[in-house]
Amino acid sequence: MKLSIALALGATASTGVLAAVVPQQEPLITPQDPPTHHHQEKFLIELAPYQTRWVTEEEKWDLKLDGVNFIDITEERNTGFYPTLHAGSYVHYPPTMKHAEKVVPLLRGLSKDNMEQNLNKFTSFHTRYYRSSTGIESAKWLYSRVSDVIEQSGAAEYGATVEQFAHSWGQFSIIARIPGQTNKTVVLGAHQDSINLFLPSILAAPGADDDGSGTVTILEALRGLLQSDAIVRGNASNTIEFHWYSAEEGGMLGSQAIFSQYKRDKRDIKAMLQQDMTGYTQGALDAGRQEAIGIMVDYVDEGLTQFLKDVTTEYCGIGYIETRCGYACSDHTSASKYGYPAAMATESEMENSNKRIHTTDDSIRYLSFDHMLEHARLTLGFAYELAFAQF
């Protein structure tokens, strides 16, 4: 995830809360073919809705160094699918928390030690850059950890699965699916890749906060959720999925591939929550702010975001603060583009977030596992309440 600067070419990024998506609409201007006089591979990126540009991979990283968010829509152009954002929400979420007596005991089982152990290992890979061999190795390790959690819970006996979602660039995404009584699905997401923007293929990118913190946060929430016998046995009303996306740093490539496939398969996704950067609090404290969970209020679903605030109030020991990150700041953008209600939580207000990301210094030593535990509580409460929601 990146702190977005004010984009002169993206005035629509400040238009307030946006939500669901109308698919299959033609863009205002159909993207033109890339210039042919350069030999470098070109990628079509979108910096705001329908504001596109052809760039090289190096130019992608230059934009990110400048704090500019984008989504890589090269493949979308090839399919002829042009979704568009619009205001409003088509899913109604519970106005109150209805399962506190079940959720609170599960929250007590969440472990900071588990998250620290997992993050220590996850950051030991030289880089998790999605085109690197160590990015594939880190994905294999994460897949084995997710598989262990599913297996140890007994959920596999009732149909729970873990899938490697393959991509052309090597590093796969991971999907853990816990079936419920219907195919209506709630998704919890984080991105597993990391990047060093100075030399992505060479320099170390431990990515402790971005987004190792979100990765182990939702992993621990999955483990905690599977302490529920009702969830394990598939007695929840809805199916729950946990996603670990590849190639977010390349422009939400992994999550786009998944949600575009879900759209083709006519999957009924009722909610998607992204956790990107959940561990850094010192910036907020240095600014004289109280520790709080940052909840995005731009380019998200308004109804789902209100529900997320309610979950935070009910199940977390700290409050929330509204913040904005602009267009295409993390994988919830992909869900929204393909018509699914999405929300996002992060560690603080964006202006106080971790400035060491995308460097060799994005290290565990700067993170608060107490804060990450609050995000795990949020994730578990969100998942359980919506698992039993009547949509």
From Swiss-Prot:
Cysteines engaged in disulfide bonds, as pairs: 325-329
Coiled coil: none
Proregion residues excised on maturation: 20-91
Glycosylated residues in this chain: 183, 235
Subunit description: Monomer.
Binding locations of Zn(2+) 1: 191, 210, 276
Similarity-based family: Belongs to the peptidase M28 family. M28E subfamily.
Gene: lap1
UniProt cofactor(s): Zn(2+)
GO molecular function: aminopeptidase activity; metal ion binding; metalloexopeptidase activity
Principal location listed in the UniProt entry: secreted
Residues where Zn(2+) 2 binds: 210, 249, 358
UniProt KW RNA-binding keyword: no
PANTHER family to which the protein is assigned, alphabetical: AMINOPEPTIDASE YDR415C-RELATED, METALLOPEPTIDASE M28 FAMILY MEMBER
Annotated keywords: Aminopeptidase, Disulfide bond, Glycoprotein, Hydrolase, Metal-binding, Protease, Secreted, Signal, Zinc, Zymogen
Signal peptide annotation: 1-19
The keyword Cell division appears for this protein: no
Pfam family, one: Peptidase_M28
Identification of the protein by name: Leucine aminopeptidase 1
Gene Ontology CC entries for this record: extracellular region
Function: Extracellular aminopeptidase that allows assimilation of proteinaceous substrates.
EC number: 3.4.11.-
Subcellular compartments: Secreted
